[in-house]
Curated annotation (Swiss-Prot):
It is found in: Cytoplasm. It comes from the Bacteria. This is Protein RecA. The lineage of its organism: Bacteria, Pseudomonadati, Pseudomonadota, Gammaproteobacteria, Enterobacterales. CDD domains: RecA. GO terms for molecular function: ATP binding; ATP hydrolysis activity; ATP-dependent DNA damage sensor activity; damaged DNA binding; single-stranded DNA binding. It holds the Pfam family RecA_C. HAMAP family: RecA. One of its GO terms (biological process) is DNA recombination. SMART domains: AAA (SM00382). The keyword Signal does not apply. The gene is recA. SUPFAM superfamilies: P-loop containing nucleoside triphosphate hydrolases, RecA protein, C-terminal domain. Keywords: ATP-binding, Cytoplasm, DNA damage, DNA recombination, DNA repair, DNA-binding, Nucleotide-binding, SOS response.
Length: 353
């Protein structure tokens, strides 16, 4: 539809004035925006990357990962850091819980010598550090562990038993307004780990909620609900956890998908096991009886042996991964594998915990 010539001149003059006052790029036509194609970082899980629709977590955005205790929240974020470091990116870990284990992080592939770490005294200090790192433009991934541990200064300086209703929610709301723009400008990914609480007196529906008020729910581009759904056993020994992640919010692709994978103790996400399963599903890896083969070459009898073979042959594993991603990420409009029922999602509440 043609625009009146006088209107075009007026629009050009207005845009010129805005750019002169606020800088080049402060206003543009959406099709000219170079950042439309969202850059992503792998989560360390191939099935979760595919469930996210864009191939990983989006740069320049806020992501929330929540779930019960020992569900794999910190492990997942450490795998994201390891993946980012392999791409040469700089990462920071804001350890508000004062519980980061460097030995475990190293086992997951994190380069702890180049990982920035802070253990802030107050919630305000933690969020100011996040903002300073984002504004620097030199840090690519920031992880905050966790929102529940971001204690307002007034609460720390007060006495146990004092009422501080709404302080944490107000602190988070103010921080989100400040952080969102800075993260976009510096293309920094900020991941918040969050805990689950129970609302008192809920007779019907899901009593679960997350801490820190509602601001994070709104500002997050991606929200992941992670749960432990079973145990991985070798004989009688439990060697890991079966884990399910639901994408309950997604602003970069279709939401409401899910991924299931194994987290092995001391090793992290069983990436090569996922590769075998997805390779068979997409008919890239042939399975005849107990034998697995790729391009006519047998790679192992049983899934465990096939997984070991892929670990020992990273070039072939990379080739299979590339083909799986091309097949499954090319169809962005595919029907979600799983839709989160309203009764299952974590409820929102104005209560502050």
């Amino acid at each position: 539809m043609a625009i009146d010539e006088n209107k075009q001149k007026a629009l050009a003059a207005a845009m010129g004035q805005i750019e002169k006052q606020f800088g080049k790029g402060s206003i543009m036509r959406l099709g000219e925006d170079r950042s439309m194609d969202v850059e992503t970082i792998s989560t360390g899980s191939l099935s979760l990357d595919i469930a996210l629709g864009a191939g990983g977590l989006p740069m320049g955005r806020i992501v929330e990962i929540y779930g019960p205790e020992s569900s794999g929240k910190t492990t997942l974020t450490l795998q994201v850091i390891a993946a980012a470091q392999r791409e040469g990116k700089t990462c920071a870990f804001i350890d508000a819980e004062h519980a980061l284990d460097p030995v475990y992080a190293r086992k997951l592939g994190v380069d702890i010598d180049n990982l920035l770490c802070s253990q802030p005294d107050t919630g305000e200090q933690a969020l100011e550090i996040c903002d300073a790192l984002a504004r620097s433009g030199a840090v690519d991934v920031i992880v905050v562990d966790s929102v529940a541990a971001l204690t307002p200064k007034a609460e720390i300086e007060g006495e146990i038993g004092d009422s501080h209703m709404g302080l944490a929610a107000r602190m988070m709301s103010q921080a989100m307004r400040k952080l969102a723009g800075n993260l976009k400008q510096s293309n920094t990914l900020l991941i918040f780990i969050n805990q689950i609480r129970m609302k008192i007196g809920v007779m019907f529906g899901n009593p679960e909620t997350t801490t820190g008020g509602n601001a994070l729910k709104f500002y997050a581009s991606v929200r992941l609900d992670i749960r432990r759904i079973g145990a991985v056993k070798e004989g009688d020994n439990v060697v890991g956890s079966e884990t399910r992640v639901k994408v309950v919010k997604n602003k970069i692709a279709a939401p409401f998908k899910q991924a299931e994978f194994q987290i092995l103790y001391g090793e992290g996400i069983n990436f090569y096991g996922e590769l075998v399963d997805l390779g068979v599903k997409e008919k890239l890896i042939e399975k005849a009886g107990a034998w697995y083969s790729y391009n006519g070459e047998k790679i192992g009898q049983g899934k465990a042996n096939a997984t070991t073979w892929l670990k020992e042959n990273p070039a072939t594993a990379k080739e299979i991964e590339k083909r799986v991603r091309e097949l499954l990420l090319s169809n962005q409009n595919a029907t979600p594998d799983f839709a989160v029922d309203d009764s299952e999602g974590v409820a929102e509440t104005n209560e502050d915990f």
